[in-house]
């Protein structure tokens, strides 16, 4: 099962009501220096305090935001895919760990 974790050296910042992911130090080798994300994505990012599978992250988000898992699955999938593709998230296979 693949789990996702934030790339070390990437921080979430809030500037004038906008959410930005900023890559510092070595993280810049793997992702753009800065990207803007929406409020929902920022909320999901804050939940990634350790590696989570998509199902685990969806479960945690449902508990925290008091929403149905089925309503969160697609937004979380899109969040994971976009940020993994751009390098801000790292996918780790449990079998490789």
Give, region by region, the residue ranges found by the protein language model.
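Acidic, low-complexity/disordered tracts enriched in E/D and polar residues
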Residues: 1-46, 91-97
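Long, charge-rich, low-complexity alpha-helical segments
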Residues: 33-97
């Amino acid at each position: 099962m693949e789990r996702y974790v934030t790339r070390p050296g990437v921080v979430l910042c809030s500037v004038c009501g906008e959410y930005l992911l900023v890559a510092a130090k070595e993280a810049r080798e793997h992702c753009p220096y800065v990207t803007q994300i929406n409020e929902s994505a920022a909320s999901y990012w804050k939940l990634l305090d350790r590696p989570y599978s998509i199902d685990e992250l969806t479960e945690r988000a449902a508990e925290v935001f008091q929403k149905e898992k089925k309503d969160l699955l697609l937004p979380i999938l899109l969040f994971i895919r976009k940020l993994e593709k751009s390098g801000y998230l790292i996918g780790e296979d449990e079998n490789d760990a």
